[in-house]
Amino acid sequence: MAWWKAWIEQEGVTVKSSSHFNPDPDAETLYKAMKGIGTNEQAIIDVLTKRSNTQRQQIAKSFKAQFGKDLTETLKSELSGKFERLIVALMYPPYRYEAKELHDAMKSLGTKEGVIIEILASRTKNQLREIMKAYEEDYGSSLEEDIQADTSGYLERILVCLLQGSRDDVSSFVDPGLALQDAHDLYAAGEKIRGTDEMKFITILCTRSATHLLRVFEEYEKIANKSIEDSIKSETHGSLEEAMLTVVKCTQNLHSYFAERLYYAMKGAGTRDGTLIRNIVSRSEIDLNLIKCHFKKMYGKTLSSMIMEDTSGDYKNALLSLVGSDP
């Protein structure tokens, strides 16, 4: 499924609002789970992974009102490691969480370009607007200006272009003539010449609607006798290549893109826990069920089975609770 349709697929949700919800007993359960010596991690998992983000915010307010403590700070003091990172991620309102991930990606030692590319290429215009607003409120600076300060060259240009959200056009109308012209322009900017006109690629990939781009990719393959992905791989490299390929993947099928992100977060030695946590948390109330279906189709195993193989303890249990039953 193309990326712009993924946001309206209600059947994709794995974490739903709890029926007959009352934040006061939930807050009390969490308080008792962390009171005194030791912590009842399972009680924390049972409450926070089975409530929607809106409900978690209500629980946090009740916790503060009843016990005079900040719930997130209390969780941080009681938990540790990857489990703490996951549970704290659940407590952020969605746009503030993504703003935090972007801020951390730029302010850590060495910029994590992959995180920035993932978020900017896969969100809609309205979501990007909310993320930018949350970023400025929480960090006192402009997301666009921080990206410009932290990246350079063509990568900076494509990220700033993506931030404008110009691809978020759900119109089904496509001008065949313009699509064909764009395909010819891409061919002329890469395969046809020695060297590459990167700005032509950036302009077309980041300013055309998703429906239009799908037609462009079809026309391009007829002209070049190779896919747009193969041309990007041969014409660019590094983070710019990753950014362009991500735009193409998200345009073609957003669920497959996230399935791939989750798979490679766990494949091979070690686990990219940041990628695993971010994508499970951020997609759990949007389309994680659909991502799970694509994951199984693409890799011949379920997302939950791979989580069981690759993680352990309370961290594993919390992830599995968020992911839900197998497709």
From Swiss-Prot:
Keyword vocabulary terms for this entry: Annexin, Blood coagulation, Calcium, Calcium/phospholipid-binding, Hemostasis, Metal-binding, Repeat
Residue ranges of Annexin repeats: 21-92, 93-164, 177-249, 253-324
Binding, Ca(2+): 266, 268, 270, 310
Chain ranges passing through the membrane: none
Protein's UniProt keywords contain Lipoprotein: no
GO biological process: blood coagulation; endosomal transport; endosome organization
One Gene Ontology term of the molecular function aspect: calcium ion binding
GO CC, alphabetical: cytoplasm; sarcolemma; vesicle membrane
Gene3D superfamilies: Annexin (1.10.220.10)
Family annotation (InterPro entries): Annexin, Annexin_repeat, Annexin_repeat_CS, Annexin_sf, ANX8
Role description: This protein is an anticoagulant protein that acts as an indirect inhibitor of the thromboplastin-specific complex, which is involved in the blood coagulation cascade.
PANTHER family on file: ANNEXIN, ANNEXIN A8-RELATED
Domain text: A pair of annexin repeats may form one binding site for calcium and phospholipid.
Record family assignment: Belongs to the annexin family.
Protein name: Annexin A8
Organism: Pan troglodytes
Gene for this chain: ANXA8
